[in-house]
Amino acid sequence: MSIRSGFLSLSLVAALWPAAPAPAADAIGIALEGFAYPHAVAFLPLTQEGEELRMAYMDVPPGANANGRTALLLHGRNFPASYWEPVVKALRETGYRVVVPDQIGFGKSSKPTFAYSLDTMARNTAALLDKLGVGKVDVVGHSMGGMLAVRFTRSYPERVDRLALEAPIGLEDYRFYVPPVETERLIEQERNLTADAYRRQLISNYAIKMPPERIEPFVRIREDVKDSGEYPRWLRSFVNSYQTIYSQPVVHEIPLVSRPTLFIMGGDDKNAPGRPFAPAELRPKMGQNAKLAQDLAAKMPAGRAEIFEGIGHLVHMEAEQRFNETLLGFLNEGR
């Protein structure tokens, strides 16, 4: 099924962000022009590899009772920063200022075609906090954002109070299972992925426990950018992020994180990037994420893991109330 309308209906946006206004009826560009975010979006100018870039972010003020703390939310590979809205709302209500960036290559940020680095992403994030005058933060990272959260905490430990990792990938070194895959092969595979195939991929790979309509905006974004004249740039940028995940493991440094750390894992989440490229006999060994999180937490100075049984990869959307209660309980410990 090919979806090429170039528009997002109000019902689809509301499925993700109930309080968001209807988006303008514009085509979706590769920086998600025409796709509404639930809060005002600003941009940090950056120069990398000779390219002038813009890093998009939402800087959401606290509610009525500010607690003087700031939360930094780091998105996953397949999701725009706007999917954090249920968590933003819960944090604001308890007094947090919330900073929610789209990393370079994602969401409303620029889409360069050069290779990505977790170290560069961490530096960009630190530069954003500097611009906003933010010192210490509580960091929450989901999926690929969990890998970045680990690298950010290791690179800037003085800037992190607490670290929450929601269904992070990178809890194993995928190079031990998956051979290198050429970028051009990945581009061709992604180009040929239909909306129906991507929808099935999300549901199966992420073991999502939500009504299908709640993941439809993710499918629509991915499909609608195909109508952009800059789609080849988006495609190469997206594929480059797989190579980052594959080639820059963080599992070996997770036990070295000294900040209080909470893994929040879906018990059914067996997501493992690159699994289809692994030898058949190795695939079942990959993606035992809940167990991997428990084992890693036990090796950390101040780590622990909470497993949400019957939940998949999108924990903060599949189990919204429980996730928010667990996260806030962790962030407020001893405060």
Q: Where do the language-model regions lie?
A:
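N-terminal cap/lid segment of alpha/beta-hydrolase-fold proteins
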Residues: I30-V60
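Conserved serine/cysteine hydrolase catalytic core
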Residues: L44, D227-A298
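Gly/Ala-rich beta-loop-alpha elbow adjacent to hydrolase catalytic centers
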Residues: G141, G145, A149
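Flexible "cap/lid" loop of the alpha/beta hydrolase fold
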Residues: R154, L163-L193
